[in-house]
Amino acid sequence: MQTSFDHLADRILAGGDATPADALAVLRADEKDLLHVVAAAGRLRRARFGNTVKVNYLVNLKSGLCPEDCHYCSQALGSRAPILKYNWLSSEEVLEQAGAGLRGGATRVCLVSSGRGPSDRDVDRVAAMAQELKGEQPGVEICACLGLLKDGQAERLRAAGVDAYNHNINTAESHHDTIVSTHSYSDRVDTIEKAAAAGLSPCSGLIAGLGETDEQLVEALFALKALGADSIPVNFLMPFDGTPSERTFELTPIRCVQILAMTRFVCPDTEIRIAGGREMHLRSLQALALHVANSIFLGDYLTSEGQDARADLEMLRDNGFAILGAEAKPAGTATAAHRAQTAHDIAGGTSVAGSAPDPAIRRRGAGTDVPANA
């Protein structure tokens, strides 16, 4: 017997669009209907992406000391979270960190820096890093995430070989001013539009669990669709101690899967990435969520530790997913290296699915002398 979610998938596969009412229905589906929701959304995922999963790797080029006051962010002005703080990594350090992620199975490297936005000198610095990385790894995709862009900066990044630019809208316009006061929603939209106009693939997503309503989640998602985001990272709030969002837990694993499924129904042909908070909030439903989403980050995040990279790859393999681009990697890399379990078990430092809900502060990889979780 077909469910209403099957009928919605049929309509979308026939060329129709999900409406805001459809999105709300998915978001508010009864928990007992979760597998029906996933099965229907999964049809859309497989129609566009098959069983592949894109693996991305973050390199935090500059950590902490940001002048913006985003309430959710451990790097923001006023945050007391005990995160790693450091200035720009050298090109050598960036190549080392990116190489670890690529050897671990990633095909896209995301070069991220804290701050309101880059100076022209910062753009030159990142452009040089991108050129060096492309020289060493010609097939790598590079996404830059440097904050609000000024006129002409996106074009310079594109000319240097950067493929994509990430700048999340984070939440609905109607909710934006409750989470940050130092920049506006329109500032964020302007940067996404600048990136797209320069030929950079626009990557923009949201953070769930910021006190938004169901309607505001839907509002944010349709805004991302209207902006033409090629990739939508869906983050789940990590409530760091020392931030205004500390001790804020509004999400359940089922709720997170419903949010991802809603995103798939509204944006059936878009890369949907399970981003920050995956391990903390999805817990044992991580693999189920990948039947709806088709992209993850490998290993650690900007300031928090993620699941052990070996566990990420084992999860993909055990559930029959194929890592996008893995067929192009030479023998002995990616999953083979992880099966051998050769690297970096850090005692007490690795987050696993189902662990305690407090974010584990990143103490390895970029900005440290400890090997990366990749």
From Swiss-Prot:
<dbReference type="GO" id="GO:0051539">
    <property type="term" value="F:4 iron, 4 sulfur cluster binding"/>
</dbReference>
<feature type="binding site">
    <location>
        <position position="143"/>
    </location>
    <ligand>
        <name>[2Fe-2S] cluster</name>
    </ligand>
</feature>
<feature type="binding site">
    <location>
        <position position="73"/>
    </location>
    <ligand>
        <name>[4Fe-4S] cluster</name>
    </ligand>
</feature>
<dbReference type="Pfam" id="PF04055">
    <property type="entry name" value="Radical_SAM"/>
</dbReference>
<feature type="binding site">
    <location>
        <position position="273"/>
    </location>
    <ligand>
        <name>[2Fe-2S] cluster</name>
    </ligand>
</feature>
<feature type="binding site">
    <location>
        <position position="203"/>
    </location>
    <ligand>
        <name>[2Fe-2S] cluster</name>
    </ligand>
</feature>
<feature type="binding site">
    <location>
        <position position="66"/>
    </location>
    <ligand>
        <name>[4Fe-4S] cluster</name>
    </ligand>
</feature>
<dbReference type="GO" id="GO:0009102">
    <property type="term" value="P:biotin biosynthetic process"/>
</dbReference>
<comment type="function">
    <text>Catalyzes the conversion of dethiobiotin (DTB) to biotin by the insertion of a sulfur atom into dethiobiotin via a radical-based mechanism.</text>
</comment>
<keyword id="KW-0004">4Fe-4S</keyword>
<dbReference type="InterPro" id="IPR010722">
    <property type="entry name" value="BATS_dom"/>
</dbReference>
<dbReference type="GO" id="GO:0005506">
    <property type="term" value="F:iron ion binding"/>
</dbReference>
<dbReference type="GO" id="GO:0004076">
    <property type="term" value="F:biotin synthase activity"/>
</dbReference>
<keyword id="KW-0949">S-adenosyl-L-methionine</keyword>
<keyword id="KW-0808">Transferase</keyword>
<keyword id="KW-0408">Iron</keyword>
<feature type="binding site">
    <location>
        <position position="70"/>
    </location>
    <ligand>
        <name>[4Fe-4S] cluster</name>
    </ligand>
</feature>
<dbReference type="InterPro" id="IPR006638">
    <property type="entry name" value="Elp3/MiaA/NifB-like_rSAM"/>
</dbReference>
<keyword id="KW-0093">Biotin biosynthesis</keyword>
<comment type="subunit">
    <text>Homodimer.</text>
</comment>
<keyword id="KW-0411">Iron-sulfur</keyword>
<comment type="similarity">
    <text>Belongs to the radical SAM superfamily. Biotin synthase family.</text>
</comment>
<feature type="binding site">
    <location>
        <position position="110"/>
    </location>
    <ligand>
        <name>[2Fe-2S] cluster</name>
    </ligand>
</feature>
<feature type="region of interest" description="Disordered">
    <location>
        <begin position="346"/>
        <end position="374"/>
    </location>
</feature>
<dbReference type="Pfam" id="PF06968">
    <property type="entry name" value="BATS"/>
</dbReference>
<dbReference type="InterPro" id="IPR002684">
    <property type="entry name" value="Biotin_synth/BioAB"/>
</dbReference>
<comment type="pathway">
    <text>Cofactor biosynthesis; biotin biosynthesis; biotin from 7,8-diaminononanoate: step 2/2.</text>
</comment>
<keyword id="KW-0001">2Fe-2S</keyword>
<dbReference type="InterPro" id="IPR024177">
    <property type="entry name" value="Biotin_synthase"/>
</dbReference>
<keyword id="KW-0479">Metal-binding</keyword>
<dbReference type="InterPro" id="IPR013785">
    <property type="entry name" value="Aldolase_TIM"/>
</dbReference>
<protein>
    <recommendedName>
        <fullName>Biotin synthase</fullName>
        <ecNumber>2.8.1.6</ecNumber>
    </recommendedName>
</protein>
<dbReference type="GO" id="GO:0051537">
    <property type="term" value="F:2 iron, 2 sulfur cluster binding"/>
</dbReference>
<dbReference type="InterPro" id="IPR007197">
    <property type="entry name" value="rSAM"/>
</dbReference>
<feature type="domain" description="Radical SAM core">
    <location>
        <begin position="51"/>
        <end position="278"/>
    </location>
</feature>
